[in-house]
Amino acid sequence: MKGTFIKEITYPECCEQINENTVIVLPIGGGSKEHGSHLPMGTDYYVTDYLAAELTRRCEVVTLPTLPFAYFPAFVGWKGSVHIEAENFMHYVEDILYSFVRFGVKKFIIIDGGISTHIPLQILSHTMRNKYGATVAVTNYNGLSGEAADQVCQQKAGGHGDEEETSVLLAIRPELVKMECAVEEYREMPVENQIQNGRAVAHISMAMNTPHGVNGNSKLAPREKGELIL
């Protein structure tokens, strides 16, 4: 193990670890968000936590506990799915990072396990640079896994509870996956056109509107694809 999980060390050890050369890792993955009838509500949390553990095993970083709640507006209509408004979410994450900035830390990695969270976190990255001189790198899970997923996945479209996500969960937490409940369904994305200041503006609804809360074909998922994607 090259890195350190902050939750596993004592306060004196923490004091030794935290300095101007420290790289802090903050994983963010929804711990209570619908993922269809076949995947657990904590799917994003499990995947992000796994990626954080792998990063910590390989790199000299100090990793914080995975943050389970974030900005997920597409799921406000689904019972049990926790959503934090964008401004509150950005302030919350800023407070977390500033807890280390005040002790000289200037380098951070956010492992972003979401899609809707990416823009708020990119904005926060600029804020942290402008206010504190801190560098915050925000990963893009879809970007990191996209090339591998394109090579191994067969679904015609996807994005949530789909072939890719189901395959990954089968690779890391197979006991939580109910493949007998897997479905193929695709989200409709209605576009509302408006004219503002002489320009056409398109507003695309991102709400999850499929019957089971899946966008893609989860029935095509095996563990082996998940291992390749990871």
PLM ranges: what are they?
Residues 1-87, 91-109, 115-230:
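Extended, histidine- and acidic-residue-enriched regions that form the cofactor-binding/catalytic faces
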